[in-house]
Amino acid sequence: MVTKEDVLNALKTVADPHMGISIVDMGLIRDVEVDDEGNVKFKLIPTNPYCMSVMAMAFQAKEAVKSLEGVKKVEVTVEGHVMEKDINEMLKEKE
């Protein structure tokens, strides 16, 4: 079974392209949830509401978690960005 720690470790492999620091270490990941069926949810909150890299980071984060054995579905929600509605729609389309 996948744990919250497994998810955070996978997310540590994703770095902010401008800072070169993992999105976990930067504090951009919140509310990680893992259920017994392997469904994972978490929020990505960029440091600035106009961050141009948030889409790339969100897709990389989703793929990093999807690659974990036992993960069935990954739901990433971007919050605090001026285009969060559009970004979240695109993230859902790529399932």
From Swiss-Prot:
| One Pfam assignment | FeS_assembly_P
Its ancestry begins with: Archaea, Methanobacteriati, Methanobacteriota, Methanomada group, Methanococci
Instruction: State the name under which the record lists this protein.
Output: Uncharacterized protein MJ1129
List, alphabetically, the SUPFAM superfamilies matched: Fe-S cluster assembly (FSCA) domain-like
